[in-house]
Protein backbone atom coordinates (compact mmCIF):
# COMPACT_ATOMS: atom_id res chain seq x y z
CA UNK A 1 0.00 0.00 0.00
CA UNK A 2 1.37 3.31 -0.95
CA UNK A 3 2.12 5.85 1.69
CA UNK A 4 1.57 9.52 0.99
CA UNK A 5 4.39 11.63 2.30
CA UNK A 6 3.80 15.36 2.59
CA UNK A 7 6.52 17.66 1.54
CA UNK A 8 7.11 21.31 1.36
CA UNK A 9 7.91 22.90 -1.88
CA UNK A 10 9.28 25.96 -0.19
CA UNK A 11 12.87 25.99 0.67
CA UNK A 12 12.18 27.88 3.87
CA UNK A 13 10.06 25.72 6.18
CA UNK A 14 9.00 28.69 8.29
CA UNK A 15 7.17 30.39 5.53
CA UNK A 16 3.46 29.96 5.36
CA UNK A 17 2.21 27.27 3.03
CA UNK A 18 -0.73 27.65 0.76
CA UNK A 19 -2.83 24.69 -0.23
CA UNK A 20 -1.77 24.70 -3.78
CA UNK A 21 1.84 24.48 -2.73
CA UNK A 22 1.50 21.17 -0.89
CA UNK A 23 3.11 18.38 -2.87
CA UNK A 24 2.39 14.71 -2.19
CA UNK A 25 5.10 12.00 -2.50
CA UNK A 26 4.27 8.35 -2.61
CA UNK A 27 6.52 5.73 -1.01
CA UNK A 28 5.93 2.55 -2.96
CA UNK A 29 8.50 -0.05 -4.15
CA UNK A 30 5.90 -1.43 -6.58
CA UNK A 31 5.42 1.76 -8.56
CA UNK A 32 7.50 2.53 -11.55
CA UNK A 33 9.97 5.32 -11.64
CA UNK A 34 8.41 8.78 -11.21
CA UNK A 35 9.17 12.15 -9.71
CA UNK A 36 6.60 11.50 -6.94
CA UNK A 37 7.60 7.87 -6.23
CA UNK A 38 10.15 6.92 -3.63
CA UNK A 39 11.82 3.48 -3.42
CA UNK A 40 13.27 1.78 -0.38
CA UNK A 41 16.96 0.90 -0.07
CA UNK A 42 16.15 -2.79 -0.60
CA UNK A 43 14.42 -1.91 -3.82
CA UNK A 44 17.37 0.20 -4.91
CA UNK A 45 19.94 -2.51 -4.05
CA UNK A 46 18.00 -5.07 -6.01
CA UNK A 47 17.81 -2.78 -9.00
CA UNK A 48 21.68 -2.30 -9.19
CA UNK A 49 23.46 -5.15 -11.18
CA UNK A 50 26.02 -7.03 -9.08
CA UNK A 51 29.77 -6.71 -10.07
CA UNK A 52 29.52 -3.30 -11.64
CA UNK A 53 31.26 -1.66 -8.73
CA UNK A 54 34.86 -2.02 -7.53
CA UNK A 55 35.07 -4.52 -4.70
CA UNK A 56 37.34 -3.66 -1.85
CA UNK A 57 40.70 -5.53 -1.94
CA UNK A 58 41.56 -6.16 1.69
CA UNK A 59 44.71 -8.25 0.80
CA UNK A 60 46.18 -5.73 -1.67
CA UNK A 61 49.78 -4.62 -0.87
CA UNK A 62 50.19 -0.93 -0.46
CA UNK A 63 52.11 0.61 -3.36
CA UNK A 64 51.56 -2.26 -5.77
CA UNK A 65 50.14 -1.53 -9.20
CA UNK A 66 46.49 -2.49 -9.76
CA UNK A 67 45.39 -4.49 -12.72
CA UNK A 68 42.12 -5.74 -14.12
CA UNK A 69 41.39 -9.29 -13.16
CA UNK A 70 39.91 -12.11 -15.16
CA UNK A 71 37.36 -14.89 -14.61
CA UNK A 72 35.80 -14.23 -11.16
CA UNK A 73 37.41 -10.81 -11.01
CA UNK A 74 36.53 -9.78 -14.53
CA UNK A 75 36.24 -6.03 -14.66
CA UNK A 76 37.54 -5.66 -11.12
CA UNK A 77 40.84 -3.96 -10.35
CA UNK A 78 43.03 -6.20 -8.27
CA UNK A 79 46.62 -6.20 -6.95
CA UNK A 80 49.08 -6.86 -9.83
CA UNK A 81 51.86 -7.95 -7.53
CA UNK A 82 54.24 -5.52 -9.31
CA UNK A 83 55.91 -2.80 -7.31
CA UNK A 84 57.63 0.38 -8.44
CA UNK A 85 60.55 0.63 -6.04
CA UNK A 86 64.01 1.95 -6.95
CA UNK A 87 65.35 0.63 -3.65
CA UNK A 88 64.25 -2.95 -4.25
CA UNK A 89 66.59 -5.62 -5.56
CA UNK A 90 66.22 -6.78 -9.17
CA UNK A 91 63.16 -9.02 -9.44
CA UNK A 92 60.52 -9.96 -11.96
CA UNK A 93 57.96 -8.17 -9.68
CA UNK A 94 59.94 -4.95 -9.29
CA UNK A 95 59.94 -1.99 -11.67
CA UNK A 96 62.66 0.66 -11.54
CA UNK A 97 62.15 4.23 -12.57
CA UNK A 98 64.04 5.75 -15.53
CA UNK A 99 66.18 7.66 -13.04
CA UNK A 100 67.18 4.41 -11.39
CA UNK A 101 67.86 2.76 -14.75
CA UNK A 102 70.05 5.67 -15.89
CA UNK A 103 72.21 5.19 -12.80
CA UNK A 104 72.87 1.50 -13.45
CA UNK A 105 76.64 0.83 -14.10
CA UNK A 106 77.45 0.63 -17.84
CA UNK A 107 79.77 -2.45 -18.27
CA UNK A 108 76.89 -4.78 -19.13
CA UNK A 109 76.06 -2.44 -22.03
CA UNK A 110 77.93 -1.43 -25.17
CA UNK A 111 80.10 1.56 -24.40
CA UNK A 112 80.22 4.39 -26.86
CA UNK A 113 83.59 4.45 -28.63
CA UNK A 114 84.49 8.12 -28.71
CA UNK A 115 87.96 7.47 -30.20
CA UNK A 116 86.72 5.05 -32.89
CA UNK A 117 87.72 6.01 -36.45
CA UNK A 118 84.83 6.34 -38.85
CA UNK A 119 84.79 3.48 -41.36
CA UNK A 120 86.98 1.15 -39.33
CA UNK A 121 85.90 -2.43 -38.76
CA UNK A 122 84.61 -3.20 -35.25
CA UNK A 123 85.62 -6.29 -33.31
CA UNK A 124 84.94 -7.73 -29.88
CA UNK A 125 87.60 -6.73 -27.36
CA UNK A 126 89.36 -8.63 -24.59
CA UNK A 127 90.41 -8.05 -20.99
CA UNK A 128 88.61 -4.90 -19.75
CA UNK A 129 86.77 -4.75 -23.08
CA UNK A 130 85.70 -8.38 -23.00
CA UNK A 131 82.34 -8.59 -24.74
CA UNK A 132 82.55 -4.96 -25.86
CA UNK A 133 82.56 -3.98 -29.53
CA UNK A 134 85.63 -1.80 -30.10
CA UNK A 135 87.57 -0.28 -33.00
CA UNK A 136 89.75 -2.93 -34.71
CA UNK A 137 92.06 -0.38 -36.28
CA UNK A 138 91.46 -1.97 -39.70
CA UNK A 139 89.77 -0.14 -42.52
CA UNK A 140 88.50 -1.29 -45.91
CA UNK A 141 89.82 1.24 -48.37
CA UNK A 142 90.94 0.44 -51.91
CA UNK A 143 92.38 3.93 -52.35
CA UNK A 144 94.98 3.52 -49.59
CA UNK A 145 98.45 2.06 -50.25
CA UNK A 146 99.37 -1.34 -48.80
CA UNK A 147 99.47 -1.30 -45.01
CA UNK A 148 99.05 -3.72 -42.14
CA UNK A 149 95.94 -1.70 -41.12
CA UNK A 150 94.34 -1.58 -44.57
CA UNK A 151 92.10 -4.24 -46.07
CA UNK A 152 91.40 -4.23 -49.80
CA UNK A 153 88.22 -5.41 -51.45
CA UNK A 154 88.29 -8.46 -53.71
CA UNK A 155 88.26 -6.19 -56.77
CA UNK A 156 91.36 -4.36 -55.58
CA UNK A 157 93.11 -7.63 -54.70
CA UNK A 158 92.36 -9.02 -58.14
CA UNK A 159 93.74 -5.94 -59.86
CA UNK A 160 96.89 -6.05 -57.72
CA UNK A 161 97.42 -9.73 -58.49
CA UNK A 162 97.18 -9.04 -62.20
CA UNK A 163 99.75 -6.28 -61.81
CA UNK A 164 102.37 -8.51 -60.16
CA UNK A 165 101.63 -11.99 -61.54
CA UNK A 166 102.55 -13.56 -64.84
CA UNK A 167 99.82 -12.89 -67.33
CA UNK A 168 98.69 -15.80 -69.45
CA UNK A 169 99.96 -15.55 -73.02
CA UNK A 170 97.12 -16.91 -75.16
CA UNK A 171 98.92 -15.97 -78.37
CA UNK A 172 102.21 -17.67 -77.48
CA UNK A 173 103.27 -20.50 -79.78
CA UNK A 174 103.90 -23.84 -78.11
CA UNK A 175 107.61 -24.63 -77.94
CA UNK A 176 108.79 -21.07 -78.48
CA UNK A 177 111.34 -19.57 -76.12
CA UNK A 178 110.08 -17.02 -73.60
CA UNK A 179 111.76 -13.68 -72.98
CA UNK A 180 111.06 -10.80 -70.61
CA UNK A 181 109.19 -7.96 -72.28
CA UNK A 182 109.33 -4.21 -71.86
CA UNK A 183 106.88 -1.32 -71.76
CA UNK A 184 103.46 -2.62 -70.77
CA UNK A 185 105.02 -6.09 -70.61
CA UNK A 186 107.90 -5.03 -68.39
CA UNK A 187 108.75 -7.98 -66.17
CA UNK A 188 106.32 -10.26 -68.02
CA UNK A 189 107.46 -13.40 -69.80
CA UNK A 190 106.29 -13.18 -73.39
CA UNK A 191 106.77 -15.17 -76.58
CA UNK A 192 110.18 -14.43 -78.10
CA UNK A 193 109.18 -15.71 -81.51
CA UNK A 194 112.21 -18.03 -81.50
CA UNK A 195 112.04 -21.80 -81.39
CA UNK A 196 114.67 -24.53 -81.11
CA UNK A 197 113.96 -27.00 -83.87
CA UNK A 198 116.69 -29.06 -85.51
CA UNK A 199 114.16 -30.35 -88.06
CA UNK A 200 113.17 -26.91 -89.29
CA UNK A 201 114.66 -25.21 -92.32
CA UNK A 202 117.04 -22.32 -91.64
CA UNK A 203 115.14 -19.22 -90.56
CA UNK A 204 115.77 -16.04 -88.60
CA UNK A 205 113.26 -17.35 -86.02
CA UNK A 206 114.73 -20.85 -85.69
CA UNK A 207 117.61 -21.83 -83.41
CA UNK A 208 119.59 -25.05 -83.80
CA UNK A 209 121.08 -27.16 -81.03
CA UNK A 210 124.85 -27.52 -80.80
CA UNK A 211 124.57 -31.03 -82.22
CA UNK A 212 122.72 -29.76 -85.27
CA UNK A 213 125.15 -26.86 -85.71
CA UNK A 214 128.09 -29.24 -85.54
CA UNK A 215 126.53 -31.40 -88.23
CA UNK A 216 126.04 -28.54 -90.67
CA UNK A 217 129.37 -26.78 -90.07
CA UNK A 218 132.21 -27.60 -92.48
CA UNK A 219 134.37 -30.38 -91.05
CA UNK A 220 138.20 -30.33 -91.27
CA UNK A 221 139.50 -32.49 -94.07
CA UNK A 222 142.45 -34.66 -93.11
CA UNK A 223 145.06 -35.09 -95.79
CA UNK A 224 148.36 -36.91 -95.60
CA UNK A 225 151.66 -36.58 -97.35
CA UNK A 226 152.04 -37.83 -100.86
CA UNK A 227 152.29 -41.57 -100.92
CA UNK A 228 150.37 -41.98 -97.65
CA UNK A 229 146.63 -42.49 -98.00
CA UNK A 230 144.01 -42.38 -95.23
CA UNK A 231 142.77 -45.75 -94.16
CA UNK A 232 139.41 -46.89 -92.85
CA UNK A 233 140.55 -46.04 -89.33
CA UNK A 234 140.22 -42.33 -90.12
CA UNK A 235 136.77 -40.87 -89.47
CA UNK A 236 136.54 -37.62 -91.44
CA UNK A 237 133.45 -36.50 -89.49
CA UNK A 238 135.14 -36.83 -86.10
CA UNK A 239 136.41 -33.85 -84.17
CA UNK A 240 140.01 -34.28 -85.27
CA UNK A 241 142.37 -31.74 -83.82
CA UNK A 242 145.87 -33.07 -84.39
CA UNK A 243 147.33 -35.42 -86.93
CA UNK A 244 150.79 -36.88 -87.04
CA UNK A 245 152.01 -38.56 -90.20
CA UNK A 246 155.22 -39.78 -91.74
CA UNK A 247 156.76 -37.76 -94.52
CA UNK A 248 158.25 -34.46 -95.48
CA UNK A 249 155.05 -32.43 -95.84
CA UNK A 250 151.32 -32.66 -95.35
CA UNK A 251 148.15 -30.83 -96.32
CA UNK A 252 145.63 -29.42 -93.79
CA UNK A 253 142.53 -27.59 -94.99
CA UNK A 254 144.17 -26.84 -98.29
CA UNK A 255 147.47 -25.56 -96.83
CA UNK A 256 150.77 -27.36 -97.29
CA UNK A 257 153.13 -27.61 -94.30
CA UNK A 258 156.76 -28.63 -94.87
CA UNK A 259 159.58 -29.95 -92.68
CA UNK A 260 157.60 -29.79 -89.48
CA UNK A 261 158.93 -32.88 -87.77
CA UNK A 262 161.76 -35.38 -87.83
CA UNK A 263 161.39 -37.69 -90.75
CA UNK A 264 163.74 -40.56 -91.27
CA UNK A 265 163.57 -42.44 -87.98
CA UNK A 266 159.82 -42.18 -87.52
CA UNK A 267 159.50 -45.64 -89.07
CA UNK A 268 161.63 -48.72 -89.56
CA UNK A 269 163.70 -48.54 -92.65
CA UNK A 270 162.41 -50.79 -95.37
CA UNK A 271 165.81 -50.72 -97.01
CA UNK A 272 167.56 -52.00 -93.87
CA UNK A 273 165.22 -54.44 -92.15
CA UNK A 274 165.68 -54.39 -88.39
CA UNK A 275 165.99 -57.64 -86.57
CA UNK A 276 164.46 -57.45 -83.09
CA UNK A 277 165.81 -59.89 -80.53
CA UNK A 278 163.10 -61.98 -78.87
CA UNK A 279 161.59 -60.30 -75.83
CA UNK A 280 163.25 -56.94 -76.47
CA UNK A 281 161.64 -53.54 -76.99
CA UNK A 282 162.44 -50.78 -79.41
CA UNK A 283 161.04 -47.31 -78.61
CA UNK A 284 160.85 -44.70 -81.32
CA UNK A 285 159.57 -41.15 -80.67
CA UNK A 286 156.59 -40.54 -82.92
CA UNK A 287 156.15 -36.95 -84.11
CA UNK A 288 152.86 -35.07 -83.60
CA UNK A 289 151.88 -32.26 -85.92
CA UNK A 290 149.49 -29.43 -85.07
CA UNK A 291 147.37 -28.10 -87.92
CA UNK A 292 147.91 -24.43 -87.14
CA UNK A 293 149.61 -24.19 -83.76
CA UNK A 294 146.38 -23.11 -82.01
CA UNK A 295 142.85 -24.39 -81.73
CA UNK A 296 139.63 -23.15 -80.22
CA UNK A 297 139.62 -26.21 -78.01
CA UNK A 298 143.28 -26.45 -77.16
CA UNK A 299 146.78 -26.42 -78.53
CA UNK A 300 149.59 -28.88 -78.89
CA UNK A 301 153.35 -28.35 -78.97
CA UNK A 302 156.16 -30.46 -80.31
CA UNK A 303 159.55 -30.86 -78.72
CA UNK A 304 162.61 -32.69 -80.03
CA UNK A 305 162.27 -35.17 -77.21
CA UNK A 306 158.87 -36.28 -78.47
CA UNK A 307 156.95 -34.90 -75.46
CA UNK A 308 153.44 -33.77 -76.39
CA UNK A 309 151.82 -30.97 -74.41
CA UNK A 310 148.07 -30.37 -74.63
CA UNK A 311 146.66 -27.17 -73.19
CA UNK A 312 142.90 -27.16 -72.59
CA UNK A 313 140.95 -23.92 -73.01
CA UNK A 314 137.75 -25.48 -71.74
CA UNK A 315 136.11 -24.58 -68.42
CA UNK A 316 135.41 -28.27 -67.84
CA UNK A 317 137.46 -31.43 -68.02
CA UNK A 318 138.23 -32.46 -71.59
CA UNK A 319 138.34 -36.03 -72.80
CA UNK A 320 140.85 -36.87 -75.53
CA UNK A 321 141.33 -39.98 -77.62
CA UNK A 322 144.68 -40.82 -79.15
CA UNK A 323 144.60 -43.32 -82.00
CA UNK A 324 147.61 -44.93 -83.62
CA UNK A 325 147.39 -46.88 -86.83
CA UNK A 326 150.06 -48.54 -88.90
CA UNK A 327 150.70 -51.35 -91.29
CA UNK A 328 153.23 -54.00 -90.38
CA UNK A 329 155.05 -56.02 -92.99
CA UNK A 330 156.00 -59.39 -91.55
CA UNK A 331 158.49 -60.81 -93.96
CA UNK A 332 159.89 -63.47 -91.70
CA UNK A 333 156.86 -65.13 -90.19
CA UNK A 334 157.32 -63.80 -86.66
CA UNK A 335 154.48 -62.11 -84.80
CA UNK A 336 155.02 -58.47 -83.89
CA UNK A 337 153.30 -56.74 -80.99
CA UNK A 338 152.88 -52.95 -81.13
CA UNK A 339 152.23 -51.03 -77.90
CA UNK A 340 151.03 -47.47 -77.64
CA UNK A 341 152.16 -45.98 -74.32
CA UNK A 342 151.23 -42.72 -72.58
CA UNK A 343 153.61 -41.48 -69.90
CA UNK A 344 153.16 -38.09 -68.25
CA UNK A 345 155.91 -35.66 -67.25
CA UNK A 346 156.33 -37.47 -63.93
CA UNK A 347 156.88 -40.71 -65.82
CA UNK A 348 153.52 -41.99 -64.57
CA UNK A 349 151.74 -44.38 -66.88
CA UNK A 350 148.56 -42.78 -68.24
CA UNK A 351 147.49 -45.77 -70.22
CA UNK A 352 148.58 -48.11 -72.94
CA UNK A 353 147.17 -50.18 -75.74
CA UNK A 354 148.68 -53.00 -77.70
CA UNK A 355 147.89 -55.01 -80.80
CA UNK A 356 149.51 -58.03 -82.40
CA UNK A 357 150.18 -58.44 -86.10
CA UNK A 358 149.06 -61.60 -87.80
CA UNK A 359 151.53 -64.43 -88.06
CA UNK A 360 152.66 -65.36 -91.53
CA UNK A 361 152.04 -68.81 -92.92
CA UNK A 362 154.80 -70.74 -94.65
CA UNK A 363 157.17 -67.81 -94.65
CA UNK A 364 155.00 -65.76 -96.96
CA UNK A 365 154.95 -62.02 -96.40
CA UNK A 366 151.64 -60.80 -94.97
CA UNK A 367 150.68 -57.17 -94.60
CA UNK A 368 148.79 -56.65 -91.32
CA UNK A 369 147.01 -53.55 -90.11
CA UNK A 370 147.18 -52.53 -86.44
CA UNK A 371 145.04 -49.89 -84.78
CA UNK A 372 145.36 -48.76 -81.16
CA UNK A 373 143.25 -46.30 -79.13
CA UNK A 374 143.74 -44.71 -75.73
CA UNK A 375 141.51 -42.22 -73.86
CA UNK A 376 142.79 -39.64 -71.36
CA UNK A 377 141.49 -36.49 -69.66
CA UNK A 378 142.88 -32.97 -69.38
CA UNK A 379 141.68 -30.92 -66.36
CA UNK A 380 139.81 -27.59 -66.87
CA UNK A 381 142.15 -24.92 -68.27
CA UNK A 382 144.98 -27.33 -67.51
CA UNK A 383 147.87 -28.96 -69.30
CA UNK A 384 148.86 -32.54 -69.81
CA UNK A 385 152.23 -33.50 -71.22
CA UNK A 386 153.00 -37.04 -72.28
CA UNK A 387 155.38 -38.99 -74.48
CA UNK A 388 154.20 -41.31 -77.19
CA UNK A 389 156.30 -44.35 -78.00
CA UNK A 390 155.74 -47.03 -80.57
CA UNK A 391 157.11 -50.27 -79.16
CA UNK A 392 157.51 -53.39 -81.26
CA UNK A 393 158.16 -56.72 -79.66
CA UNK A 394 158.62 -60.22 -81.00
CA UNK A 395 156.44 -62.94 -79.65
CA UNK A 396 157.93 -64.90 -76.80
CA UNK A 397 158.86 -67.57 -77.54
CA UNK A 398 159.49 -66.19 -81.01
CA UNK A 399 158.62 -67.92 -84.21
CA UNK A 400 161.38 -66.66 -86.44
CA UNK A 401 161.36 -67.53 -90.08
CA UNK A 402 163.20 -64.43 -91.16
CA UNK A 403 163.76 -60.81 -90.34
CA UNK A 404 161.11 -58.52 -88.94
CA UNK A 405 159.79 -56.14 -91.53
CA UNK A 406 159.04 -52.46 -91.11
CA UNK A 407 155.98 -50.75 -89.69
CA UNK A 408 154.73 -48.87 -92.69
CA UNK A 409 152.49 -45.79 -93.04
CA UNK A 410 152.15 -45.02 -89.33
CA UNK A 411 150.07 -42.06 -88.19
CA UNK A 412 148.60 -40.69 -84.98
CA UNK A 413 145.33 -38.81 -84.43
CA UNK A 414 144.65 -36.94 -81.18
CA UNK A 415 140.93 -36.24 -80.97
CA UNK A 416 139.01 -34.19 -78.40
CA UNK A 417 135.79 -36.00 -77.49
CA UNK A 418 134.37 -33.23 -75.30
From Swiss-Prot:
Q: Which domain of life is it from?
A: Viruses
Q: What is this protein called?
A: Uncharacterized protein 317L
According to its UniProt entry, this protein's organism is Invertebrate iridescent virus 6 (IIV-6)
Amino acid sequence: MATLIPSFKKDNPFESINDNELIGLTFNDQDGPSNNILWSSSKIVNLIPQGQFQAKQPDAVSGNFAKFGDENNSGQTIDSGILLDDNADPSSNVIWSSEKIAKIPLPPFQLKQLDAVSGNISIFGSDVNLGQVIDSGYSINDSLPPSSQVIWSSNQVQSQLLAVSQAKQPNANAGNLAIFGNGVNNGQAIDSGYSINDLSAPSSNVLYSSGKIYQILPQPQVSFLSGVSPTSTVNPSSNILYVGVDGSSYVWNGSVYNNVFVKSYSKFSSQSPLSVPPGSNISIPFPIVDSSGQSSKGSISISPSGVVTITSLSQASSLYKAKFSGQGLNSGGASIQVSFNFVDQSNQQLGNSSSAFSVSVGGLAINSQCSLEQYFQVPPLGQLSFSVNIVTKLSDPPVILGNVGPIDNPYLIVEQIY
